[in-house]
Each structure stands twice: as C-alpha cells, then as structure tokens.
C-alpha cells in the first residue's frame, strides 16, 4: 500500500475489515481504537531504517475511560497506551502486505513516567520498527514512545506483533 497517512474515517474502515481484505488484519473498533489518525507510516524510516509510524489521539474529558478509571481521579489507563502501540505495529505489518490477523506477542520492557489526564489535548504515538520478518509468519518488532502534549510519558522496547492466517491454535 502506498498511502502514508490515514484519517479517522479510514481507520474506522480498517476496524470494519474494509482495508486489507477478508481474513486479514483489522484495527479494533471504538472504544478500543486508540488513535484518531496516522500522521506518517513508512517502510524505511525510523532509527533502524525498518519502518516508522506516527499517530495521534485527541483527548477530551468525555472519553469513556475517564469515567471509570478512576472515580474522582480520572487518568487514561497506561495499558491502553501500550495497546495503541501494539495496534500500530500490527497495522504496519498489514499495511506492508502481511496476510493474517494481528495478535500482540509481547513486549520486552515498558516504562511509565507520566499520565494522560482529561485536561490534556493530544497523545502522540511513535513506533520505530526494529525488525520485520516476512516468512510463513509475518512478525514485527519495534520500540515505541508515547507523548502527551509534547512530553514523553511512556516508552516500550521490543514490542512484538504477529499476523496469523490461522488463529485456531493460538
């Protein structure tokens, strides 16, 4: 796929299975879709020259997780930021032609050094692909960081996602 950026409407189409074809990777539907747009995606950028993704999520106080996490102390769950990075890694694999359904396979290290609150405006996700395997199993490995309003608050090393044409034994 030659397209290098995606709107929210296009990401929603991906969540419905309308982007990469039947049986292939989808993004989650709302409320679990953790980005509003992909600003840039490529196959040869990033720190390792294996690919790069930059995406954003607009923050507003009405987002579903602020009402339940936590009452009187609203904060976006850190695991949602981690999931967003896995979502983007899987999207990159499908965008680069990988067949199958995306599944998170792990992460080497995650650090949280800040939080996302209702008064913040924008979350930015950055993924540097460090390894892309295109064999029987399509698998991507990458390092990610999350920023809120321009300040780095999460980092993740060795995020792993695979694409599976058969998930019955996974």
Swiss-Prot record:
What binding partners and quaternary form does the record give?
Homodimer.
Instruction: Reply yes or no: does the keyword Lipoprotein apply.
Output: no
The primary site where this protein sits is cytoplasm
From the UniProt record, which GO molecular function terms apply?
Answer: (3R)-hydroxyacyl-[acyl-carrier-protein] dehydratase activity; trans-2-decenoyl-acyl-carrier-protein isomerase activity
Its pathway?
Lipid metabolism; fatty acid biosynthesis
The organism encoding this protein is: Idiomarina loihiensis (strain ATCC BAA-735 / DSM 15497 / L2-TR)
Q: Per the UniProt entry, what is one GO biological process? A: unsaturated fatty acid biosynthetic process
Q: What is this protein called in UniProt?
A: 3-hydroxydecanoyl-[acyl-carrier-protein] dehydratase
InterPro entries reported for this sequence: FabA, FabA_FabZ, HotDog_dom_sf
Q: Which residues form the active site?
A: 69
Residues of the signal peptide: none
């Amino acid at each position: 796929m030659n397209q290098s950026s995606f709107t929210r409407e296009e990401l929603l189409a991906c969540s419905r299975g309308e982007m990469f074809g039947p049986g292939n990777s989808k993004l989650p539907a709302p409320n679990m879709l953790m980005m509003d747009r992909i600003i840039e995606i490529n196959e040869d950028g990033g720190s390792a020259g294996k690919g790069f993704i930059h995406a954003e999520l607009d923050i507003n106080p009405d987002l579903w997780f602020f009402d339940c996490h936590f009452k009187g102390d609203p904060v976006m769950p850190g695991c949602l930021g981690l999931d967003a990075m896995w979502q983007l890694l899987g999207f990159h694999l499908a965008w680069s032609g990988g067949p199958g359904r995306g599944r998170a396979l792990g992460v080497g290290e995650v650090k949280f050094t800040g939080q996302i609150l209702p008064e913040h405006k924008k979350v930015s996700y950055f993924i540097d692909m460090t390894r892309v395997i295109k064999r029987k199993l399509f698998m991507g490995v990458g390092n990610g960081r999350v920023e809120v309003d321009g300040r780095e608050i999460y980092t993740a090393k060795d995020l792993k996602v695979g694409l599976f044409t058969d998930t019955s034994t996974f």
